[in-house]
Curated annotation (Swiss-Prot):
Family: Belongs to the NPR3 family.
Subcellular location: Lysosome membrane
Keyword match DNA damage: no
GO BP: any one term: positive regulation of autophagy
Taxonomic lineage of the native organism: Eukaryota, Metazoa, Ecdysozoa, Nematoda, Chromadorea
Main subcellular localisation: membrane
Name of the molecule in the record: GATOR complex protein NPRL3
Superkingdom of origin organism: Eukaryota
Source species of the chain: Caenorhabditis elegans
Span list, region Disordered: 37-58
InterPro entries the UniProt entry points to: HTH_NPRL3 (IPR056603), Npr3 (IPR005365)
Assembly behavior: Probably part of the GATOR complex.
Keyword set, alphabetical order: Lysosome, Membrane
Cited Pfam families: HTH_NPRL3, NPR3
Length: 511
């Protein structure tokens, strides 16, 4: 797939937002943003009869009936329906309230989560619903996310109604905007309403940034994130909610994070978040951040989970000189990224230089060389971080298989047979039968130059990690799950390299 096939400039799936309200005067849509005028259509020609014989039957033609409604109902929309028609469609039976709806009208998708409300001192149930019009092609998890946002807003409005009659007041102002002497009910209602402006601001924030964090009517806190759109805006390959949830589920203490933008919390935020962010660094793992900050590892996981789900960070492996990187295979907006890197680094180093160095794959220390001036080392380190942040580099990890030696391999020829204790360990292990004999010979040959206890330790570790040597677990995961030292486990793999096949690929959880 070429970069041209991926639209990194795509807009959000959000197309419009409407406020549906029922009250004493009936149902109506009191707000639509943005209000786009209906597209002009060519005038239709009256069908002509196929015969001059007036008695011959002519095929009937369906025509749209003029909507007789008034006020908000007579306002035309881009959806080939007036607001009155849409209000009739959106009205939900009371039994279906407090549940999401998802419908298509004229190939346009509408989602919402209607809620019921009551006027103070009355028993009649009315409805409030924030309806989102979504573009074609959005995935189900995106539609579900906007249903959740609709529910959050509606719940907030109902709560405000219970506190001080908020929706009663809005309904009264909507009735005033529909008076016969007022030709533009939407504009009239917007002059007094406390709903219209917040909905417009939310719409713009989602389209511009992909997420919302604000107080509705300066009273109720609301949060929302369209993950794929937010990542696209940050020039990162977009991921949906399901992909991000899968990453969160597989997150381990040996992972690290890279912040995608300035996420320093507001003054009223939890001070633990600020404390953790002050210890956040590309060369630190989650466990390192927990140790340095003194925050329990579980709490660190919860904060990082929040950052990932709100597209404020991506998961990486901590920077280390032995890390192996290569240029990413996913399509990238190279022209836009070149401009961004030029603005950040100027003429000191070019984007292409960083990408070219790691193709073919190389370790980090070959790029950030110790013989370079400290300033140059710092610039190159920042370049690598920027490339990782925008997922233009990916790290390759070492994976392992246990395989029978090749036919041309030089097999061990020990002078003494393998001890019975070692043979028993090998026979009771999960090692493939076709390599057990070779492993026994390797142990016997090792005893010629190494102590018995050392060989037993090496064999025991090899047998212990063998179930994970199936090509699905890389070195870091093997080391972590078995609580082993990296140098020691690498020594074990070297000792039994005759029956081990290795290969490198990305860890798709983090990439």
């Amino acid at each position: 797939m070429s970069a041209k096939e991926v639209d990194f400039e795509r807009e959000s799936h959000l197309h419009a937002v409407m406020c549906f309200l029922t009250g004493q005067s009936g149902e109506k849509i009191v707000s639509i943003y943005p209000h786009r005028k209906p597209a002009t259509k060519a005038p239709s020609k009256d069908p002509q009869p196929s015969s001059s014989n007036p008695g011959q039957c002519v095929k009937p033609v369906l025509t749209s009936v003029k909507d007789p409604s008034y006020g908000f109902g007579r306002v035309d929309t881009e959806f080939d329906m007036s607001l009155g028609m849409l209000a009739y469609v959106f009205k939900t039976q009371e039994i279906a309230c407090n549940d999401g709806f998802d419908m298509k009208i004229n190939n346009q998708r509408f989602v919402a989560y209607p809620k019921t409300w009551k006027a103070r001192g009355e028993s009649t149930n009315y409805q409030i619903s924030i309806v989102f019009a979504l573009k074609n092609g959005c995935e189900q998890h995106t539609a579900s996310a906007y249903q959740t946002l609709s529910n959050k807003i509606a719940v907030s409005l109902v709560m405000l109604q219970n506190y001080f009659g908020f929706l009663e007041r809005e309904d009264k102002w909507a009735d005033n905007a529909e008076e016969p002497n007022k030709d533009h009910p939407l504009e009239e209602f917007a002059k007094t309403s406390f709903i219209v402006q917040p909905l417009a601001e939310m719409f713009e924030e989602v389209r511009n940034r992909g997420n919302i964090h604000k107080y509705l009517i300066n009273f109720v806190e609301l949060g929302f994130c369209d993950e794929a759109h937010a990542l696209t805006k940050l020039n990162v390959v977009p991921k949906g909610r399901q992909e991000i949830d899968e990453i969160v589920r597989k997150m381990k203490p040996y992972h690290g994070i890279l912040l995608l933008e300035d996420v320093w919390p507001t003054p009223d935020a939890n001070p633990i978040v600020a404390k953790l962010l002050s210890h956040c660094s590309p060369d630190r793992s989650i466990l390192d951040m927990s140790t340095a900050s003194g925050i329990p590892i579980f709490e660190v996981f919860m904060i990082i989970r929040h950052l990932l789900q709100w597209t404020r960070a991506i998961l990486i492996y901590p920077l280390c000189n032995t890390n192996i990187y290569t240029s990413a295979t996913s399509p990238q907006p190279l022209d836009k990224m070149a401009e961004k890197f030029t603005a950040q680094f100027g003429n000191t180093i070019h984007l292409a230089a960083g990408l070219a160095h790691f193709n073919p794959p190389k370790t980090l220390d070959t790029f950030i060389r110790k013989n370079l001036p400290l300033h140059e080392q710092g610039v190159r380190a920042k370049l690598v971080v920027a490339l990782l942040r925008h997922q233009m580099l990916m790290q390759l990890h070492q994976f392992y298989y246990i395989l029978k030696p090749y036919s041309i391999a030089i097999l061990p020829e020990p002078k003494e047979p393998c001890p019975a204790e070692f043979t028993k360990i090998i026979e009771e292990s999960t090692l493939p039968n076709d390599v057990k004999g070779v492993v026994a010979d390797i142990c016997a040959e090792m005893l010629e130059t190494t102590s018995y206890a050392s060989v037993k330790r090496t064999l025991s570790l090899f047998v212990k990690v063998a179930p994970m040597m199936d090509g699905n677990h890389h070195l870091e995961e093997i080391k972590y799950k078995n609580n082993l030292d990296r140098t020691e486990i690498e020594g074990v793999f070297v000792s039994f390299k005759l029956v081990i096949a290795t290969f490198r690929r990305p860890d798709f959880v983090a990439e």
